[in-house]
From Swiss-Prot:
Pfam families: SDH_alpha. This is UPF0597 protein YhaM. InterPro entries: Ser_deHydtase-like_asu, UPF0597. One of its GO terms (biological process) is L-cysteine catabolic process to pyruvate. GO terms for molecular function: L-cysteine desulfhydrase activity.
Amino acid sequence: MFESKINPLWQSFILAVQEEVKPALGCTEPISLALAAAAAAAELDGTVERIDAWVSPNLMKNGMGVTVPGTGMVGLPIAAALGALGGDAKAGLEVLKDASAKAVADAKAMLAAGHVAVMLQEPCNDILFSRAKVYSGDSWACVTIVGDHTNIVRIETDKGVVFTQADNAQEEEKTSPLGVLSHTSLEEILAFVNAVPFDAIRFILDAARLNGALSQEGLRGSWGLHIGSTLVKQCDRGLLAKDLSTAILIRTSAASDARMGGATLPAMSNSGSGNQGITATVPVMVVAEHVGADDECLARALMLSHLSAIYIHHQLPRLSALCAATTAAMGAAAGMAWLIDGRYDTIAMAISSMIGDVSGMICDGASNSCAMKVSISASAAWKAVLMALDDTAVTGNEGIVAHNVEQSISNLCSLACRSMQQTDKQIIEIMASKAH
């Protein structure tokens, strides 16, 4: 139907968004280990009795302090146990969506019995690595995930190797829809958003549905640090204005509260992260409601936000010391600016100001406090948009911001790729010392 109207570049953009914007139940690093455990358990006939798991330092960092949905418990061991005992290996990032109350109870009992061990993989050259080895009687199965949260590269049992990705890995890399992001630009992304048929991108409205539901849940319950509901109370006390800026702050942080606090609702993720998906979605939704945008305008704004966030994050490691809520919020800035103004220059100025503002915020692991980073990133995005609407932005004479937005993005990402690697090691060392 509309495929005939879409040129190959635009089709690649759509495929990239479909690849990177997916539903995810629970923080994606523990969920990656849960998926490995579920896939391993699926290879066994008997009941899983014991689990040994190994993860990369970055995955350990992002799994130590976050609540696993439906369990009320924090950390990687409960994720591995519930994945093995109640997970659906075919559900990807929603591996735990159908876990029963009995599976949760059995997983907790397995932990209490000391039958789950999660260790650092040493040495480990992969930023994202999870391996689960599950045992049932004399049988065992082991599944390894590398590079991406759901990318299973090896399945092995006591009877031999069942699957290995090594043979077709190079071919898969060539056909990845994300390859187009290495040689495109924000201008091309904006041209796509302005002209692509609505029906081709209607699917992105699911992000508003899922992340909007998370936001509502965050305001209903006392999830995580309950930042969103706390700020509502302060509005009622007269300590915060009830305006658009506050609405962006409250509704975005509420979604992250629910996400990190263990609510059993999926987030629409971006680049493998629920919080990045929330940050790229909710601020745009709030502004769209404020300006009275219809579904088509909302879809175009969300597509610009999510694709811009993916485009920027594609220049980063999958996990790093840089808090990627900041880069997702750069996408949100683009989407919000488009809704109000629509011009490329306004969008570029907003992103440049974001880079001059929140760049360098560290990622010290997934936890309830992510909602604070999400909220400050969303607020910074709106501030940058307001500045751009007044033809004001951080200029190329200041800090790491360059005279064009593409170079500014490159400068920011080079920090995470090179200079912040030592920062990441120090963060992991500090967090590991607290665990002993």
